[in-house]
Amino acid sequence: MRMLLCLNVLTLSCVWAIAMEIPMSTVVKETLIQLSTHRALLTSNETMRLPVPTHKNHQLCIGEIFQGLDILKNQTVRGGTVEILFQNLSLIKKYIDGQKEKCGEERRKTRHFLDYLQEFLGVMSTEWAMEV
């Protein structure tokens, strides 16, 4: 019953966020604030071990980040304002999954591929932490 209630609340919040067209940047900012607010509660179980990617390029470790999040969510007392934190993180995951679907390939001319590759390498050179 509790799981059903949680799923209903999560579904309602997703629908609400979509209906209200809240920008994902706003959801991310609110989630960062909530994370800071609830950090003490989330770190109260010092015996829990979560997977932490050793790679510094977070874009490459999304799966591992959300795997750790699922473990944390399952080990944390639910309810109250911490529930909103997990709902927002779920919204962010759904957004990222939706964006990953846009990675589907489309056959184009070599010039288009090279333009995309150049843009990708530009992002790598400016936004990714490069290891020596």
Curated annotation (Swiss-Prot):
Description of how the protein assembles with itself and partners: Homodimer; disulfide-linked. Interacts with IL5RA. Interacts with CSF2RB.
Residue stretches in coiled coil: none
Subcellular location: Secreted
GO cellular component, one term: extracellular space
Key words, A-Z: Cytokine, Disulfide bond, Glycoprotein, Growth factor, Secreted, Signal
Originating gene: Il5
GO biological process: cytokine-mediated signaling pathway; immune response; interleukin-5-mediated signaling pathway; positive regulation of B cell proliferation; positive regulation of cell population proliferation; positive regulation of DNA-templated transcription; positive regulation of eosinophil differentiation; positive regulation of immunoglobulin production
Residues of the signal peptide: 1-19
Annotated GO MF terms: cytokine activity; growth factor activity; interleukin-5 receptor binding
Entry similarity comment: Belongs to the IL-5 family.
Protein origin, superkingdom: Eukaryota
Entry annotated with the keyword Glycoprotein: yes
Main location: secreted
Role summary: Homodimeric cytokine expressed predominantly by T-lymphocytes and NK cells that plays an important role in the survival, differentiation, and chemotaxis of eosinophils. Acts also on activated and resting B-cells to induce immunoglobulin production, growth, and differentiation. Mechanistically, exerts its biological effects through a receptor composed of IL5RA subunit and the cytokine receptor common subunit beta/CSF2RB.
InterPro entries noted in UniProt: 4_helix_cytokine-like_core, IL-5
Gene3D superfamilies assigned: 1.20.1250.10
Protein name in the entry: Interleukin-5
Residues carrying sugar: N45, N74, N88
